[in-house]
Amino acid sequence: MKSSRIAAVLCVVAFCLAFAAQAMATKYVALGDSYSSGTGTRTFYEPSCQRSVYAYPYLLHEAHTSWTFVNATCSGATTASLLASQVSSVTSDTNWVTYTIGGNDAGFSHVITECALPSWASNCSGAINEAQTIIKNTLPGRLDTVNNEIKSRAPSAKVIVLDYPRLFNGEDCNAFTFFSSSEEARLNETADLMKSVISAAATRAGANFTFRDVIPAFIGHAVCDGGSGSSTEWISGLSNPTGESYHPKVAGHANGYYPAVHGVTG
């Protein structure tokens, strides 16, 4: 009888310890657009959203294999689609959240497509002006909505908010694009504007939100740095398929984005 009681007690203790361990498990949720899913790396384990094992969320997962990892990122995501189909992955037991968002709200793809055309066939300046107006006047409120929704779902979660790199170095080495140096400068200025808006929104969100700037890491590694397709170039220029264009390559995630998030999570 005594041995059976001891066995019962041990079973209860083991159950409690297992339950406690499960309750304390760290949960990491990755949200965001193509700069988080891994478009540009050319290798996807979930093709419909272009989620890659080479993207920074997966690299962070590999550094913390004991964590529960939920990858809700999806290429093409906007603030609206993040709220509609991604943020539900954030639950009260979430410990870490990362995201990039806002580029598609500003019409990033349209702007790049317009500015890549010859000057006589495009309205690059108008496209940039329109994007900058959205970034300044519309995006702040949308980012606040995203951040408030994350906070309401996981009040204790630590949230790492990332920006977008400057794409260009002042030259165009691709055969079928026609970016002028002045257009590249304005596009880089738009990345800087995006940075300031994203950073300000993260600050407004409170102490649990940390903004990480990736722009410095990509200096010297923009499109055409070292020549098209070189190892120095961490961002793809015009690519085939075209959807891979103007996104971080494997090296951009490994050396640009991943250190930014890992520097916070450890």
Explain the meaning of each model-derived region:
Residues 1-9:
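Bacterial N-terminal signal peptides that target proteins for export
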Residues 24-73, 88, 117:
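Serine-esterase "nucleophile elbow" of acetyl-processing enzymes
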Residues 27-38, 68-73, 95-100, 105-107, ...:
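Structural recognition of the beta-strand scaffold that forms the well-ordered cores
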Residues 39, 81-135, 166-168:
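Oxyanion-hole/transition-state-stabilizing segment in secreted/luminal serine hydrolases
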Residues 61-67, 141-160, 193-212:
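A structural motif corresponding to the C-terminal end of an alpha-helix
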Residues 165-266:
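Catalytic His-Asp segment of secreted/periplasmic serine-dependent ester chemistry enzymes
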